[in-house]
């Protein structure tokens, strides 16, 4: 269970809990693969680092356009 940043703060950065989970998981995998962290925190845990990056607005996402039936 995360205490900081709160889920309320994180939800202001994304449109759903699913998006938040996917965004943090993808970034954590990138960190495990060797990407440089974008925040200066004491933790070495990739999920914690990714969560903090999202909270600071350093990691964003873009929804693809929906394709409907014509």
Swiss-Prot record:
<keyword id="KW-0808">Transferase</keyword>
<dbReference type="GO" id="GO:0003899">
    <property type="term" value="F:DNA-directed RNA polymerase activity"/>
</dbReference>
<dbReference type="InterPro" id="IPR036161">
    <property type="entry name" value="RPB6/omega-like_sf"/>
</dbReference>
<keyword id="KW-0240">DNA-directed RNA polymerase</keyword>
<comment type="function">
    <text>Promotes RNA polymerase assembly. Latches the N- and C-terminal regions of the beta' subunit thereby facilitating its interaction with the beta and alpha subunits.</text>
</comment>
<dbReference type="GO" id="GO:0003677">
    <property type="term" value="F:DNA binding"/>
</dbReference>
<dbReference type="InterPro" id="IPR006110">
    <property type="entry name" value="Pol_omega/Rpo6/RPB6"/>
</dbReference>
<dbReference type="InterPro" id="IPR003716">
    <property type="entry name" value="DNA-dir_RNA_pol_omega"/>
</dbReference>
<protein>
    <recommendedName>
        <fullName>DNA-directed RNA polymerase subunit omega</fullName>
        <ecNumber>2.7.7.6</ecNumber>
    </recommendedName>
</protein>
<comment type="subunit">
    <text>The RNAP catalytic core consists of 2 alpha, 1 beta, 1 beta' and 1 omega subunit. When a sigma factor is associated with the core the holoenzyme is formed, which can initiate transcription.</text>
</comment>
<dbReference type="GO" id="GO:0006351">
    <property type="term" value="P:DNA-templated transcription"/>
</dbReference>
<keyword id="KW-0548">Nucleotidyltransferase</keyword>
<comment type="similarity">
    <text>Belongs to the RNA polymerase subunit omega family.</text>
</comment>
<dbReference type="GO" id="GO:0000428">
    <property type="term" value="C:DNA-directed RNA polymerase complex"/>
</dbReference>
<keyword id="KW-0804">Transcription</keyword>
<dbReference type="Pfam" id="PF01192">
    <property type="entry name" value="RNA_pol_Rpb6"/>
</dbReference>
